[in-house]
Amino acid sequence: MAWAPLLLAVLAHTSGSLVQAALTQPSSVSANPGETVKITCSGDRSYYGWYQQKAPGSAPVTLIYDNTNRPSNIPSRFSGSKSGSTATLTITGVQADDEAVYYCGSADSSSTA
């Protein structure tokens, strides 16, 4: 059986400071169901979050906050990491339902501080 690739669009987004930082993300990522997808976001902030928006105009859902923390309602296939100035969202075993726009956000301080 052939699988149709997913298109996972990603957009950079900043928050948490009056000074706008430049965040760099790929414009889009495609994958086949079951594959592992890594989306990166580079900038100069200490903390990053990842957000998923499935339909235009709908509220984004927080997938990851403070680099690595996942809300309890988010599936474990979503994980976050940070190395140096680059944050990474990893989707392990991507599903068709994961097709969405993914936003990266950054801040100078932890959201739980």
From Swiss-Prot:
Matches recorded under PROSITE patterns: IG_LIKE
Location of region: Framework-2: 50-65
Q: Name one GO cellular component term.
A: extracellular region
Q: Name one Pfam family in it.
A: V-set
Asked whether the UniProt record includes Ubl conjugation among its keywords, one would answer no
Under the heading InterPro entries, the entry gives: Ig-like_dom, Ig-like_dom_sf, Ig-like_fold, Ig_sub, Ig_V-set, IgV_Light_Chain
Detail the disulphide connectivity of this chain as listed in its UniProt entry. Answer: C41-C104
Q: Which domain of life is it from?
A: Eukaryota
Q: Where is the region Complementarity-determining-2?
A: 66-72
- Outline the segment boundaries, as ranges, of region: Complementarity-determining-3: 105-113
Instruction: Kindly indicate where the leader peptide sits in this chain.
Output: 1-21
Stretches the record annotates as Framework-3: 73-104
Q: Where is this region: Complementarity-determining-1?
A: 42-49
Q: Which GO terms describe its biological process?
A: adaptive immune response; immune response
Write the record's keywords in alphabetical order, separated by commas: Adaptive immunity, Disulfide bond, Immunity, Immunoglobulin, Signal
Q: Where is this region: Framework-1?
A: 22-41
User: What is the recorded name of this protein?
Assistant: Ig lambda chain V-1 region
Give the originating organism: Gallus gallus (Chicken)
